[in-house]
A protein has these predicted regions:
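Alpha/beta enzyme core
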Residues: 2-212
Length: 212
C-alpha cells in the first residue's frame, strides 16, 4: 500500500487526514492532489514520521541536509545537527553521509528524528563499489536498485534518484563547454558510470522497476 495507490482508489489514509488538518485544507483536496501526483506525503511505516504534505497548494517546506564525509566523520555531531534542525523548525532531514559506517549512521539518525527522513542511495552504492571493486564505475545496476530497497527497509521515507542523468543528457554535456560539467555529486556518479559502460542510467531505463 502506498499513499498514491490508495488515493487513486478513492481512499483517504490517516496521513492524508493529518496533512489536511495541518494545512487547514479539505481532506478530499489532499487526496486528489496525491492521486494526481501533485502532492506527496513521505511516509515509510517502518519509520512512521509525522505526516507532511509537499506540493501544489501547500505551505513551503524546509529540508535540512546533514551528513558525514570521508575526511570528517563524527556521528554524535550528526545526531546533534539533526536535533538542532528539528528544533529550528525543519520539516524534513536528509542524510548525505559518505564517510563512516553508513548503515549505522542512517539507523541512528532515523531513531533520532520523527520528521520525514531522506537519503541519496547512489552515494552508498558508489562508496561500497569503491570498497569492494575499487571504483564507482564498477557498481552494477543491481547494486543501485538493491541499495534503494535496503534503505527503504531501514525506514527511509524519501530518496533522491538521479533519473534525469541519461545517455542523451551526458552526451549534451560532453559537447558543451561548461566550467564544471556536473555539480551534483550523485549525478556525477551516474555520469561516470554511463560514460564508462556506454549504457543508459538503470534508474531511467528501468524506472517502473525502481518504483516497485
Amino acid at each position: 500500500m502506498t499513499q498514491i495507490s490508495e488515493a487513486k482508489r478513492g481512499r483517504t489514509t490517516p496521513q492524508m487526514k493529518n496533512v489536511a488538518q495541518s494545512e487547514k485544507s479539505a481532506v478530499e483536496l489532499i487526496r486528489r492532489g496525491v492521486a494526481a501526483g501533485h502532492i506527496v506525503i513521505p511516509f515509510n511505516p517502518v519509520h512512521a514520521p509525522s505526516s507532511l504534505g509537499i506540493g501544489a497548494g501547500l505551505r513551503v517546506k524546509v529540508n535540512a541536509n546533514i551528513g558525514t564525509s570521508r575526511e570528517y566523520c563524527r556521528l554524535k555531531e550528526e545526531v546533534e545537527k539533526a536535533k538542532v534542525a528539528v528544533a529550528a523548525g525543519a520539516h524534513a532531514v536528509m542524510d548525505l553521509s559518505t564517510g563512516g559506517n553508513l548503515d549505522t549512521i542512517r539507523r541512528t539518525l532515523l531513531q533520532t528524528v520523527s520528521i520525514p527522513f531522506g537519503t541519496v542511495p547512489i552515494y552508498q552504492a558508489g562508496i561500497e563499489a569503491i570498497k569492494r571493486r575499487g571504483s564507482i564505475v564498477d557498481m552494477t545496476a543491481d547494486d543501485m536498485f538493491r541499495t534503494v530497497e535496503h534503505q527503504a527497509k531501514q525506514g527511509v521515507d524519501f530518496a533522491v534518484v538521479h533519473v534525469g542523468v541519461t545517455l542523451e543528457s551526458v552526451e549534451r554535456l560532453r559537447k558543451q563547454q561548461r566550467c564544471i560539467p556536473m555539480v551534483s555529486r550523485g549525478g556525477s556518479f551516474h555520469m561516470a558510470w554511463i560514460l564508462h559502460h556506454d549504457q543508459e542510467n538503470p534508474f531511467y531505463k528501468d524506472f517502473e522497476y525502481l518504483l516497485e
